[in-house]
Amino acid sequence: MKKLMMAVALAFVSMAGMAQNFRANLDESVKPGDDFWQYAVGNWLKNNPIDKEYPMNGAFIDLEKANELRINALIMKYADKKDLPQGSDGQKIGALYRLLMDSVSRNKMGYEPIMPYLKQIRSIKTREEAMKVMAELDAKGFNTAPYGLGLSLNPFNSSTLMMSVRHGGASLAQEYYAEPNEQQQAEVAAKKSLYKDFLKMVGNSDADAERMMQAEWAIEHRIGVKKLNQVESRDPMKTIHFTTWEQLLKDFKGIDWVAYRDALNAPKDIDTLNVEQPEPLHEVEKVLAETSVDDLKAYMELKAVYSYCDYLNDAFEDRLFEYRKAVSGVQEQKPRWKRAVAEIDDNLSETIGKLYVAEYFPETSKQRVYRLVKDLQQAFEDRLKDNTWMSDSTKAKAVEKLHTMYINIGYPDKWEDMEKFIDIREDQNLVENFIRIKQEVRAANYRKYWRKPFNKKLMPMPPQMVNACYVPNFNSINFPAAILQPPFFDPEADYACNYGAVGTVIGHEMSHGFDDEGCQFDKDGNLVNWWGAEDKAKYDERTKVLAEWFSEQEALPGLKVNGEKTLGENIGDNGGIQVAYRAFENRLKQEPLGDVDGFTPAQRFYLAYARVWASNITPEFLALIVNSDVHSPNIFRVNAALPMIDSWYDAFNIQPTDKMFIPKDKRALVW
């Protein structure tokens, strides 16, 4: 199911002892006001090279490694137990682990698990056959259809689900097809090389593989250039085009929607739908009508191989890693057990989550964090009420939305329980299992949600995920268990550090409810305008300052951040820091703190914030983030975010002569 959520790529370190470690992290040869990133964590950056298994390092990667071990420990309880009842949680975990770890059988089979489907594609003789097979295999998870049909939330009534129609086929963002920059061109070249090699690995000659790859890419390119670009796709109104089932059949008659619906076993009583992006979908119609049957077969074969390459032999996984190495700069493939842990966590996330919570997350942690969230919520309300540019009526609606936010902490109050429909059979290979899983879960979703009220209190992230998010359609903020326990959050530590780290993250998620996307949704999660026209104009003026400022930040020579694409996340950081600092000040009035190791409480707040984002990164991965992520690179979440915050200037006595100084009237004060 499609969920619109805004997540912050988080990084946490133990708060215990953080203040004592600040001095060791510093590069005191640099003034705080000249380069705060280098000042605050320069020595840490120097002493912490990147692990070869990762494209970056930092607190987030450290926690990912620790979490990997925790989840692996849960899995190991079932790894050797082959006599558990079929369908039980332990049986599913153990069986999937053994299938993933059985390199002998997987290498012996090679690409045999997908061979029946490749034969089906290769035997196609006519366009009609191609359309039929395209729909049938797409329903089995092979992504052979450059179009899609599935459940999504109704943007205007988010307590209900509806059917949405979307294009497929283009695996990269629109910019990679339209006007790719140097780094994007390199990624395209790496992907085309991967595609060709995959086609050779399933028995095609070098010449045939080259022809088939070029045919596939021609289709992908035609669709890709018609997509919304990354800035446009952030506007929810640009992806809403309601129609009826009957009108869909007339407007997009180049696609056999009835056959596709039936292949998916989707409900037959579809009335209203949303066509997310009509233009690329019309291009799909043209592609299906104008492309030769042989080229359509090439497209389908490549998509079929790519969709299940992770479940074939080592050769496919190794080649996929070489692609990842080229585009991210990672140097070593993760060992098989880590890849197995990730796969189990992806496919049995709720099952693992229940075990994770029981083992690692006490109820007391949930209550402590809840109190902290309410503290931040009050600080946000204080700032809203102090706001001088909003009218009282819009301000009142903003406060109402803030306090209507549903708060998920640690784990959901009610589990979705969709994984009970997953059946893992050890007498079948991984491909057969995952084909069945996709079909079973899709059918279960239709049974549970079609024409029935939707529970917006569901948590869109599993408890074991080290992250957090805001969901506009739910108006909910979500903090999984993995980030809310020692060493991620330490309620006994210096609260100046806690507010600077986890506090800014809580504030970040709350601020997403009022960023340039989130502000378009009302307190109930519906896409309804609640702003006065003059208020919205003033808001846009303020956020424009932030967008223009971040667009000046150069990540690599000639490669700058796109301030419009990253605006939502930058508003989140701007608001998150402001709100967390206000909450910190409120606490400071009640419980005064002294200096520690020469740092004031305010300085510790900002040093903790910088330490959260401290990371080394490969040039390739840095380029990938700038080109395809809505988050700004970590360095700019410090050096570009903090110059907009008045209290940072006060904490470190930043002067007009300092390099990072921005005049007060030029700073972006949003929330």
Each model region followed by its residue ranges:
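Bacterial Sec-dependent N-terminal signal peptides
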Residues: 1-20
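Active-site-surrounding "flap" and adjacent substrate/cofactor-binding loops of secreted or lumenal enzymes
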Residues: 31-34, 39-105
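Short secondary-structure subsegments characteristic of cysteine-rich extracellular domains
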Residues: 53-75, 207-226, 498-504, 602-606
